[in-house]
UniProtKB/Swiss-Prot annotation:
Record-given protein name: Disks large homolog 2
The keyword Cell membrane is assigned to this record: yes
Species per Swiss-Prot/TrEMBL record: Homo sapiens (Human)
Residues recorded with modification Phosphotyrosine: 58, 505, 750, 755
Lipid attachment, kind S-palmitoyl cysteine: 5, 7
GO annotation, biological process: anterograde axonal protein transport; cell-cell adhesion; cellular response to potassium ion; chemical synaptic transmission; establishment or maintenance of epithelial cell apical/basal polarity; nervous system development; protein localization to synapse; receptor clustering
Purpose of the protein: Required for perception of chronic pain through NMDA receptor signaling. Regulates surface expression of NMDA receptors in dorsal horn neurons of the spinal cord. Interacts with the cytoplasmic tail of NMDA receptor subunits as well as inward rectifying potassium channels. Involved in regulation of synaptic stability at cholinergic synapses. Part of the postsynaptic protein scaffold of excitatory synapses.
Lineage: Eukaryota, Metazoa, Chordata, Craniata, Vertebrata
Encoding gene, per UniProt annotation: DLG2
Subunit structure: Interacts through its PDZ domains with NETO1. Interacts with NOS1/nNOS through second PDZ domain. Interacts with KCNJ2/Kir2.1 (via C-terminus) through one of its PDZ domains. Interacts with KCNJ4, Interacts with FRMPD4 (via C-terminus). Interacts with LRFN1, LRFN2 and LRFN4. Interacts with FASLG. Interacts with KCNJ4. Interacts with ADAM22. Interacts with DGKI (via PDZ-binding motif).
Intracellular or extracellular location(s): Cell membrane; Postsynaptic density; Synapse; Membrane
Length: 870
């Protein structure tokens, strides 16, 4: 039969091993890693501000809660700096202002970040305004702006102090607070006209703003928020993120709604005339501009409970409001519905419109956010709601009617020391809060309130509350596990006795902080430097396994199912157990967001499963389910044109020692980055029925699929043509040298002649617009990746023996069993390199799935492995 006839050839064959075959796979590709640490937000009341600041020595951003403004007159100080900084040869001009605010019961109404111990922008040690709280003293006064730098608080110089010193200066400034601030001078606008030709990908940009949907508070203009790769705007090159759209053809976009602007743009013809307003100067290397978030930087975001158009409640995440003279990052969720093309993935922008209007926010309400700094500590968490810092939205528009959270800071303070009864009704997100504690009898504390969850909507719980009892079960001395079990098993209606204990909670935080510091010191002293922080991370990964949320009983809230090969946008990877993510579709991020198991959780559970499997398995029996962690020594697998086999001795050695060469690697998620390619991707199909699939693709689509010409040292026969049948190599030594230099993706020897498929042969086909069908082993996948010819690698995974025998009726049951086992081993060996795994009960079903995968993965934008660490 098919396989048996080649077994007789084994003794005549020897294999060329590449030097890197036995080395661990590190995807030796040219990749960049961008790990830019972004600021974090802590929302606290004025009363316990100093306590939490003492605990959070590493906090990057603090909240000064809102109150009323003073009627103090405006005092403008026009002093200038002694030395004017230069950027790209241009002077950066600043203006200075002294602003007097009257503090009320809750604070000054703005947030700050920065300091000498944790600079907010570049290496600048200044204290910067990061948010103006609506309704607060600063907002009502109207002069303080986001990105203003505070130089002095009353008579205290804070131009070069630590973050905690600045907070202390603000806290102790008294009821009348004089702020001396520095800001960039507003940049004027230049009007230009741009002519665009739509083309197949449309105009290629996204917009935000409009009447009732202001992108910049107080400004009804329509702004460009994204330039899409391959679209008309990108090809033209003049339209930029941050440009203000003034006119489309003969239609003015001044004082129009968001919907009207969208309709005007969508109803244009092939030629579109735009009139746009541009900043006169953009400092491309401005040290005071925020870091590039195109890669892994995550700006501080806050959850807002919004009222949707259909009357239902939804969540929306907003960035700190944009100030004049500043660049502002634009989050993807603001760009979903109004793209005029189908972008393959969300692209984040860092340049925004610069205007001279005050930037105090008017349409956003703060929601208390847990910094989740405990997530990396050696204390377990029980998540009753979604993880903090979520991005949840179902509309691209930026503003709808906001709903004030019912829990106010003033009320939180008044609840201190009073045990109180809280009745909650579980919703789709559980109870909507997280707990920590339960070690050494320290108590169970609320560490996070999910915006819009039952706890938040009730307004009766807050961060720092100690849970005394749940449905009559005393939790004052309970362990974390006991508290989690009590909450999880409490039914739909849960009665909680809680007591606000800020001092106890602060001591608990301090304890965790000390433990983290000890862990950090130990990690650094041991040289590992691998201690992971709790900072919110955003990245893209490729799933290396199937996940069904309905089968995971441990989900803390709404889960997200996915398949092997799916690209996931991980919005928050700060938690050790659960990540927040969306699937990345062809048109961008999916609206559906949920939690997925973290890399750590996946690997831990799989190792536990494998231990059980090995414990229960009989000696010498291989798990037929084929767990995805098995990794064996790489070997050449049969190719119809090149039968590259191991020699008999090698085969017997590996058969007798099945665990030899196995690496303890569990496939969970692979970090990826998006890349544009200018070639047609090669196609490698592995698994049963691959030959028939390959033949059908070339037969049905000869204009889209082809094969490359292999090399050989075998003498040319009379009927053969050099360059058509083979590239006939005269010098065996030269071909051996080329093999050693990795110029071949696969090579071997048969009857004393060398055969091989060269990278150049594959590239020749790929650059001529055809998918090169390759009948090679899984080893070739990585070698093509190294050559930056990223193949579409599809693995056909049989469901069971029956479909195999049905699709190939010549197979006996024994042969089908061997084919099935070979497929499982193939997945174990090369699973990390597959683009997709397909399954089907019929050949037609498998063929159609393969065609769909190839169509979706053809490019020009593809996801490739990156070196970012998980």
């Amino acid at each position: 039969m098919f396989f048996a006839c080649y077994c007789a050839l084994r003794t005549n064959v020897k294999k060329y091993r590449y030097q890197d075959e036995d080395a661990p796979h590190d995807h030796s590709l040219p990749r960049l890693t961008h790990e830019v640490r972004g600021p974090e937000l802590v929302h606290v009341s004025e009363k316990n501000l100093s306590q939490i600041e003492n605990v959070h020595g590493y906090v990057l951003q603090s909240h000064i809660s809102p109150l009323k403004a003073s009627p103090a007159p405006i005092i403008v100080n026009t002093d200038t700096l002694d030395t004017i900084p230069y950027v790209n040869g241009t002077e950066i001009e600043y203006e200075f202002e002294e602003i007097t605010l009257e503090r009320g019961n809750s604070g000054l109404g703005f947030s700050i970040a920065g300091g000498t111990d944790n600079p907010h922008i570049g290496d600048d040690p200044g204290i910067f305004i990061t948010k103006i709280i609506p309704g607060g003293a600063a907002a009502e006064d109207g002069r303080l702006r986001v990105n203003d730098c505070i130089l002095r608080v009353n008579e205290v110089d804070v131009s070069e102090v630590s973050h905690s010193k600045a907070v202390e200066a603000l806290k102790e400034a008294g009821s009348i607070v004089r702020l001396y601030v520095r800001r960039r001078r507003p940049i004027l606008e230049t009007v230009v006209e741009i002519k665009l030709f739509k083309g197949p990908k449309g105009l290629g940009f996204s917009i935000a703003g409009g009447v009732g949907n202001q992108h910049i508070p107080g400004d009804n203009s329509i702004y460009v928020t994204k330039i899409i790769d391959g679209g008309a705007a990108q090809k033209d090159g003049r339209l930029q993120v941050g440009d203000r759209l003034l006119m489309v053809n003969n239609y003015s976009l001044e004082e129009v709604t968001h919907e009207e602007a969208v309709a005007i743009l969508k109803n244009t013809s092939e030629v579109v005339y735009l009139k746009v307003g541009k900043p006169t100067t953009i400092y491309m290397t401005d040290p005071y501009g925020p870091p590039d978030i195109t890669h892994s930087y995550s700006p501080p975001m806050e959850n807002h409970l919004l009222s949707g158009n259909n009357g239902t409640l939804e969540y929306k995440t907003s960035l700190p409001p944009i100030s004049p003279g500043r660049y502002s990052p634009i989050p993807k969720h603001m760009l979903v519905d109004d793209d005029y093309t189908r972008p393959p993935e969300p692209v984040y922008s860092t340049v925004n419109k610069l205007c001279d209007k005050p930037a105090s926010p008017r349409h956003y309400s703060p929601v208390e956010c847990d910094k989740s700094f405990l997530l990396s500590a050696p204390y377990s968490h029980y998540h009753l709601g979604l993880l903090p810092d979520s991005e949840m939205t179902s509309h691209s528009q930026h503003s709808t009617a906001t709903r004030q959270p019912s829990m106010t800071l003033q009320r939180a303070v008044s609840l201190e020391g009073e045990p109180r009864k809280v009745v909650l009704h579980k919703g789709s997100t559980g109870l909507g809060f997280n707990i920590v504690g339960g070690e050494d009898g320290e108590g169970i504390f609320v560490s996070f309130i999910l915006a819009g969850g039952p706890a938040d909507l009730s307004g009766e719980l807050q961060r720092g509350d100690q849970i005394l009892s749940v449905n009559g079960i005393d939790l004052r001395g309970a362990s974390h596990e006991q508290a989690a079990a009590a909450l999880k098993g409490a039914g739909q209606t849960v009665t909680i006795i809680a007591q606000y204990q800020p001092e106890d909670y602060a001591r608990f935080e301090a304890k965790i902080h000390d433990l983290r510091e000890q862990m950090m010191n130990h990690s650094m002293s041991s040289g590992s430097g691998s201690l992971r922080t709790n900072q919110k991370r955003s990245l893209y990964v490729r799933a290396m396994f199937d996940y069904d949320k309905s089968k995971d009983s441990g989900l803390p809230s709404q889960g997200l199912s996915f398949k092997y090969g799916d690209i996931l946008h991980v919005i928050n990877a700060s938690d050790d157990e659960w990540w927040q993510a969306r699937r990345v579709m062809l048109e961008g991020d999916s609206e559906e967001m949920g939690v997925i198991p973290s890399k750590r959780r996946v690997e831990r559970k799989e190792r536990a499963r494998l231990k059980t499997v090995k414990f229960n398995a009989k000696p010498g029996v291989i798990d037929s389910k084929g767990s995805f962690n098995d990794k064996r020594k790489k070997s050449f697998i049969f190719s119809r044109k090149f039968p590259f086999y191991k020699n008999k001795e090698q085969s017997e050695q590996e058969t007798s020692d099945p665990e030899r060469g196995q690496e303890d690697l569990i496939l969970s998620y692979e970090p990826v980055t998006r890349q544009e390619i200018n070639y047609t991707r090669p196609v490698i199909i592995l698994g049963p029925m691959k030959d028939r699939i390959n033949d059908d693709l070339i037969s049905e689509f000869p204009d889209k699929f082809g094969s490359c010409v292999p090399h050989t040292t075998r003498p040319k026969r009379d009927y053969e043509v050099d360059g058509r049948d083979y590239h006939f190599v005269i010098s065996r030594e030269q071909m051996e040298k080329d093999i050693q230099e990795h110029k071949f993706i696969e090579a071997g020897q048969y009857n004393d002649n060398l055969y091989g498929t060269s990278v150049q042969s594959v590239r020749f086909v790929a650059e001529r617009g055809k998918h090169c069908i390759l009948d090679v082993s899984g080893n070739a996948i990585k070698r093509l990746q190294v050559a930056q010819l990223y193949p579409i690698a599809i693995f056909i995974k049989p469901r069971s023996l029956e479909p195999l025998m049905e699709m190939n009726k010549r197979l006996t049951e024994e042969q089908a069993k061997k084919t099935y086992d070979r497929a499982i081993k193939l997945e174990q060996e090369f699973g990390e390199y597959f683009t997709a795994i397909v399954q089907g009960d019929t050949l037609e079903d498998i063929y159609n799935q393969c065609k769909l995968v190839i169509e979706e993965q053809s490019g020009p934008f593809i996801w490739i492995p990156s070196k970012e660490k998980l």
